[in-house]
Amino acid sequence: MTINYTTNLSLAEPVTGTESGTWGDDVNKGLTDYLDISIAGTLALTSASFTANALTLANTTGSSSGNGITTTTAQYYIIKCSSLSTNVTITAPSSSKTYVVVNLDPTYTVTIKASGQTGITIPVSSKAL
């Protein structure tokens, strides 16, 4: 079974002539589910989602056995933060991915950045693209 993955979103690319009997699952769980969350999916985060006020997102991949989407999957388009107990930082992969970050918290800020960068801070009750 041979599946390649795209560079930016880690979408499944089954190799021609492989995946006999599982190709549909590979596409549905490795491509369709990811396209859905990368175009219109919302990742809802609260203070419980963060460890030491930080969260690192990572590209995940799907296969015939499951889509691999988790609460730290980087492919989501919208990230909503609420019920925070302190200012938080989200670190996303360094790629050409766009996020809409919505800070619904009335007290604390949300910073989103790539590893090694300072990032941008979304003020309380604000959103940024």
Question: Model-predicted segments: where are they?
Answer:
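Surface-exposed loop/edge segments in extracytoplasmic proteins
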Residues: 117-121
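C-terminal beta-strand-rich structural cap/linker in extracellular carbohydrate-active enzymes
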Residues: 122-129
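Exposed extracellular interaction/assembly regions and N-terminal maturation sites
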Residues: 2-11, 15-110
